């Protein structure tokens, strides 16, 4: 199921809604109201309702949203029908954390391969994911129809890795280095700069500290 022109931020929140709904479902609830979802995610009920209206879903005034029904609908919208395969480049602590996170998840995303240059990691299996030498990247990406790449290498290596991923047929890249990347328009790029995020948190923590003294 594909909805044209769905805002990027809405897609992000839909993923968050699904995680929240799964948590609520685990508590044996069948229905939930927008204000309950909003409270869990620290957003407004209006935002929740607006996002769900964009995907054509409305709840019952008395009972709220059917949790299982909404989880299924979100899955049809943000997941690929056939599933998508992921590779991580750079098997340091962050790369290993990604592999560990994917282990046992019931997601349509599956971690297929890891790449590194460290001889102690190459040809080993980490939580079910084989690690290959970076020189094997084009071959492994194409062989396994991998469409998403996660970059967790030192920042100076990121542009070269991104280029190799693009040339190998990758359609989406998650960049976890502080180095901004340039990729073709047909490749979706999401960049997460942990230093910037940490400095942002530090700024607002300081602001709140001064405010509530």
Question: What is each PLM-predicted segment?
Answer:
Residues 95:
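N-terminal Rossmann-fold NAD(P) dinucleotide-binding loop
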Residues 1-30:
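Extreme N-terminal segment that seeds HTH/winged-HTH DNA-binding domains in transcriptional regulators
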Residues 17, 22-25, 129-213:
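Phosphate-bearing ligand-interacting subdomains
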Residues 31, 35, 40-85:
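HTH-adjacent hinge/linker in prokaryotic transcriptional regulators
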